[in-house]
Amino acid sequence: MSAEQKQGGTELAPRYDAKLVEDEYYQYWMDGGFYRAPIVEGKQPYTIVIPPPNVTGTLHLGHALNNTMIDILIRWKRMQGHPTLYLPGTDHAGLATQIRVEEDLRKSGGPTRHELGREAFVAKVWDWKERYHATITSQLRKLGVSVDWSREAFTMDERLSRAVRAFFVQLYKKGLIYQGTRITHWCPKDQTALSDIEVEYEERQGHMWHFRYPLADGSGSIVIATTRPETMLGDTAVAVNPEDERYKHLVGKMLRHPATGREIPIIADEYVDPAFGTGCVKITPFHDPNDFEIGLRHGLEMPQVIGPKGEMTEAAGKYAGLDRYECRRRIVADAEAEGWLVKVEEHQHAVGCCARCGTVIEPLISRQWYVKMKPLAEPAIRAVESGQIKIVPERFTKVYLHWMENIQDWCISRQIWWGHRIPVWYCDDCGHLTVSETDPTRCEKCGSANIRQDEDALDTWFSSALWPFSTLGWPDDTADLRYFFPTDVLVTGYDILFFWVARMIFSSLELTGKIPFHTVVLHGLVRDAQGRKMSKSLGNGVDPIDVIDQYGTDALRFMLVTGSSPGNDIRFHTERVENARNFANKLWNASRFVLMNLADWQPAAEGAALQYDVADRWIRHRFNEAARAVNELLGEYQYGEAARTIYDFIWSEFCDWYIELVKPRLYNPADPTRAAAQETLARVLEGTLRLLHPFMPYITEAIWQKLPLRSPQVETAPEIARAAGRDALPPSISVTAYPTPVEGWADAEANERMALIIDTIRALRSIRAEFRLGEHTRIDAVVMATSDQALAILNEGRAFIENLGKTGQLTIQPVAEAKPKNAAAAVVTGAEIYVPLGGLIDLPKEIERLTKELTTTGDELAKLEKKLSNEGFLTKAKPEVVEKTREEAAALAEKRQALENRLAMLRSMQG
């Protein structure tokens, strides 16, 4: 659609059709090239890279929140005149994607990964990637994100793959990558090693079994306790604390293992806590990380009794071939039958599970590749401690520093096929390892062609760690890298602070010598209305596209940000999306009204003398205040507060007050202030659309295109046009200047005057509602001013009060001792308001009605108070249920007080 078509006509459709507008305008933005990021020498760029969605599937509400938050910042900064890059892309998500494809093959009855072979299986995963990449990019477009698609990246693109190899080789040459045989977390289902942070710990109810181990010489026995009886088949010692007086005399003696019959020694090690359990700890070096370290210190044997699939090995003797859990059951049964089971206790403990598939992990000794973390962590710690990198909210700084200060070496090898294959080649002739950025054909040491590449792939986070600079061309010295790096802000979920954020920081400092971004903004998770995590098992997941199809993109975006605050989870409520949709409709209808009343209007020439009244001056002042607040709040990453500020300005001040206040002037062609009202409406609406645009881009663009008034484009607009390969840039609100307070619009006096007028109207409306006086019933009112200044203001606003207060006879006078009789009263700053009720209500009937309502309210409150005084309810009910009950009780108490006050007033009138 051309710019001319967009500008045609000034009339909006009777109703807002979100789907029609969204489909047309995203294509319009793409055709216009508005979001191509220009390189403008001398201009400070603003860059944010997308946290790349995994190609495992489709986007969820968390992605919608994340990309909305980023897009708000990007649109804001673009409108401030910065050359702005929002860089999109996707992540190959090695293990997670491989799992999904294997599941897909299994469900379809296809061959297994191993039946296919590596090359054919990887081809299947590429097909999967293409399919879901297309879905993800389509979803991002639906969300209206203003990314530069010409710079889109994928973590396994040729360019990014080269960066990954360069990273590996550089760290290897510096001695920061090594191959070691250590105990690692192993997933029996996915058949791969995992890093520490890929293990999630779940609190589970289990058992603690106590077994008797007899001394080999028959002189007695000791008791050990374990939660994993199956591992005892790999015991090679029992350890006690060297200072534990109970067992000092036994150190060095031999035990006869009750399950295997082998003799094992009693050893002394300071690791053992004498106060825990019996003070005796069985040592199984192959299957426990702490036992592994003890085994190394004492030179113990390390038999493997559990295999990589979770099955018992030949070393498990008669239990060989059993599943680990079946083995547990058999051992406990044998112990009970043979008399060496002492007791069984209920025991709650943390169980490590694979973060990808949920399988209970198995600690196993294996040879893996590791990154030496201490030298990399130190500069990453300094960058945050010194304030070079700021984490928002600040409380996560301590979390980051604690993890980095206690960081363990990073296991980076994975026994999978999808991903970046480790760039190491083994020579079968001389045993040398060739580590290279390019595929070698011969061993670099002996020249043999008999070399083979390491079978494993790198942890997916190894490539993601390079995302802020590999996407811009690193390791090459590109124009994009020089101009757009370091990036500015990273917006992401707090749940990947360690997985991703920390790794980007130390990788960037190591490879580029620069921080990757100056600010990290962390947001929470999107939960369901009950506060539960969304999951397939609960069936409470929400597809953002379903929400968009029903309510529109702008409504979803606005709901997500108004419910958010940095670092905190948000709850998804359909009602709140409906409220956001209603807000969009309110804006559309108000804009339609404004446009219909601008048909005969021409913008005033600069310096023209228009007769602005107090309402005009007030709304301009309120606009300035809103613009100032929103800019400050966005600068502090307070998206929710910024959005709510705009909402309040548009809904309440502009629509509910200003438009209603100016209607009589608009409807009267002879009114000398009509032109000023039109000028104010046009300019405030145009500025308001620009203020709201980063939050609700579609509806603001659609309305703005119809305005007979345009703000100038930002300075970088011509450069954006050139970046898009165009001679000129067609108009779009997204490349106009973001509002700041307008010079000459500040008017504290008008603000103060209108505050009294509005408070007076609100008081009249409140009395009308309180006494159920019909909306169309004209009510007489006496307004007593408490000062000469207030009297002047109220007289100036008489027409406003009469019109919006729907008064009959309105008396405005100085405050007097004699008050109107039989009148409802209200007090505001600067005035007392009285509404005589004679003839408006049947006093006895109203007293009877309110008395009944007071009794009912009191009974309901008593029930809730009884519930809240019940300890059983307070301790057993869910916290959210208790909180809701408290809120209901507080509301009823407030209602009771209001009813009592109203009854007292009516009874005093009754005499």
From Swiss-Prot:
So where does this one cross the membrane? none
- Residues noted as binding ATP in the record, renumbered to the chain: K536
**Gene3D superfamilies of this UniProt entry?**
HUPs, Isoleucyl-tRNA Synthetase, Domain 1, Valyl-tRNA synthetase, C-terminal domain, Valyl/Leucyl/Isoleucyl-tRNA synthetase, editing domain
What keywords are assigned to this protein? Aminoacyl-tRNA synthetase, ATP-binding, Coiled coil, Cytoplasm, Ligase, Nucleotide-binding, Protein biosynthesis
Q: Please report, in chain numbering, the residue ranges of the motif 'HIGH' region.
A: 53-63
**Where is it localised?**
Cytoplasm
Q: How does it assemble?
A: Monomer.
Q: Per the entry's comment, what about the domains?
A: ValRS has two distinct active sites: one for aminoacylation and one for editing. The misactivated threonine is translocated from the active site to the editing site.
UniProt source species: Symbiobacterium thermophilum (strain DSM 24528 / JCM 14929 / IAM 14863 / T)
Q: What is this protein called?
A: Valine--tRNA ligase
Quickly give the catalysed reaction.
tRNA(Val) + L-valine + ATP = L-valyl-tRNA(Val) + AMP + diphosphate
Q: Name one GO molecular function term.
A: valine-tRNA ligase activity
Please tell me which top-level EC class this enzyme sits in: ligase
This entry carries the following GO cellular component terms, namely:
cytosol
The record's listing under NCBIfam families reads: PRK05729.1, valS
- EC number(s) on file: 6.1.1.9
Coiled coil residues, start to end = 845-910
Family listed = Belongs to the class-I aminoacyl-tRNA synthetase family. ValS type 1 subfamily.
Q: Write down the superkingdom of origin.
A: Bacteria
According to its UniProt entry, the protein's GO biological process terms are: valyl-tRNA aminoacylation
- Chain location of the short sequence motif 'KMSKS' region per the record: 533-537
